[in-house]
Structure formats: structure tokens, C-alpha cells
From Swiss-Prot:
The protein's name: 4-hydroxy-2-oxoglutarate aldolase, mitochondrial
Location of this chain's protein in the cell: Mitochondrion
Major location category of this protein: mitochondrion
PANTHER family associated with the record: 4-HYDROXY-2-OXOGLUTARATE ALDOLASE, MITOCHONDRIAL (PTHR12128:SF66), DIHYDRODIPICOLINATE SYNTHASE (PTHR12128)
Organism lineage string: Eukaryota, Metazoa, Chordata, Craniata, Vertebrata
Gene name of this polypeptide: HOGA1
Catalytic residues in the record: K196 (schiff-base intermediate with substrate)
Amino acid sequence: MLGPQVWSSVRQGLSRSLSRNVGVWASGEGKKVDIAGIYPPVTTPFTATAEVDYGKLEENLHKLGTFPFRGFVVQGSNGEFPFLTSSERLEVVSRVRQAMPKNRLLLAGSGCESTQATVEMTVSMAQVGADAAMVVTPCYYRGRMSSAALIHHYTKVADLSPIPVVLYSVPANTGLDLPVDAVVTLSQHPNIVGMKDSGGDVTRIGLIVHKTRKQDFQVLAGSAGFLMASYALGAVGGVCALANVLGAQVCQLERLCCTGQWEDAQKLQHRLIEPNAAVTRRFGIPGLKKIMDWFGYYGGPCRAPLQELSPAEEEALRMDFTSNGWL
């Protein structure tokens, strides 16, 4: 059961989030944030001694801020959030809020394993500047994470969150796909505005769009590898790791899809598939950070137990970008 401190934090977070005037949901008003657009999931830079390098974080954000992104995602999978302390997670959100352009949205990953911890983290992230909370599925006890359990979890979080909630399904990391029936039920909640689906099943994305079409609910593709297909099926944007290095190109793909230039979109999408796979399922965060170094950003090391790429892996990573004309 949530204690008095949490309830107090909820009220404080609600007051602060409303005062920032970003058009988010407020109890009784029915207002929601429009999350359509492209978001890079920001990496967390570390020093050689594994401390968070906030200076490099701000440098990366200043460079990324030159592209027409809708906003930024922090403390998602690419932010290595499972390896950060609670205070580090909040400090990262705060620093990003201060460094990013004021007209961009900040989606902060606030998911934890328990419902109570998720509520507390969500409220705290609202207080340090998040516009919306992106909440990953709890998964440690995934054998018991039925649709009913997940609906209960997300409903409680959304009820108590002072900012809108975005559902986050990433089965490659959690071993758990948020069931479509649960998504449909949750889409009816006035404080759940959308979903990031990283599973890669575009038929599932199309089905979710179809079944939630009567709700004020938006779907974001979780990867640049299936961004065009997702747009064709009704998604409104994407959270794309590849946008950390090919921001202009991912935004161009968005523009081509949104203006119906499908032939040109197809050509560009083809050239993004291999690089995207390299920085996601093939080489993961170590691969993304390495290519960021090559593109003039600060990638740097990951926190243990993640390891840097081997020389052979680096060469394969380079080939995936050079063969498609990006290096």
C-alpha cells in the first residue's frame, strides 16, 4: 500500500507538471500530449571509471537538438537504466530537461519491477521535468504476468501518475510481449496516451492500431528497421536507436512516409535496415556507442557486465554502415 509520502509526491508532481503547460492530461480535463514523431533513445555516457558523464550527455544533446526530433527518450533500454541507481536515473532526466530544446518532449523510462516502485519513480521523474512516462513491462516474474496482472499494474500507475503514461513492450529484453488484449483495455484509460512497441511484428502493430482506433491512443515503432511498415499500418512515429547517429535520415524517412512518398521512403528504408540491426539486436548498446564515437558523438564505454566490441565485431559494424553509404 502506498504511504503518505507517495501520495504527497503525487500531488506535488501533478501541480508541477500542470504548471509547465505542455498540454498533458489533467484529471477532469481530458487533455493529452501528442507523441507523434521521431525520438532518439538517449544513451547514458560513462567515464573510464564507470561514473555517469553528465558533461558528455549535455554535449550529445546539443548536437542531437539540431535535428527535427519530436523529443527525446531517456532511461529506456539504450540508456542502460537497469545499471543505474534511482538517484542517477533522476539526475539524468533532470540534466536532459535542462539541456534539451524547450519545445521538445521528454519521455522518461520510469518502469520498475513493482507497481509501488514504478509509481514512486514516475512521480519523481515528473518532478524533475519529464513530460510523459514510458513504462516497461515488469518481467522478473513473467510467468505470472498475465493480462490481468499487467492491466492492474498499468492502471495503478496511470491513476497515480501526474504525467501521461506510454506503454513500453520490448520482448527482446524482457521475454514478455504486452498482450494485445491488455493494450486494448489500457488504451481506454484517460492517462495512457500510447505505446512504444519494439517487438518488430508489424502485423501486431497494425492490429493494435486497428483495435484502439476509437481511443485517443498513439503507437510508436520501437526501431528504425520497421519504421516505414509501421507508418503504413497507422503508427505515428518511432523511438529509434539509429536516430542517435543517423538523425537526419530517420527524420527524412518520417517525412517521406507522412507525405505519401512511398517509393522514396522504400529506398531509404532499405539502406537503414542493416545499420539498424547492427546497433540493436546484433551488437546492442556497445555497438551503438561505438558508432556514436565514429560519428562525432560521445559513445564511450558501457557499464559492466556489458563489454566493448571485439575488433572483428567492430569491423562488421563498420561494414554494415559503409556498405549502405553511411561511412
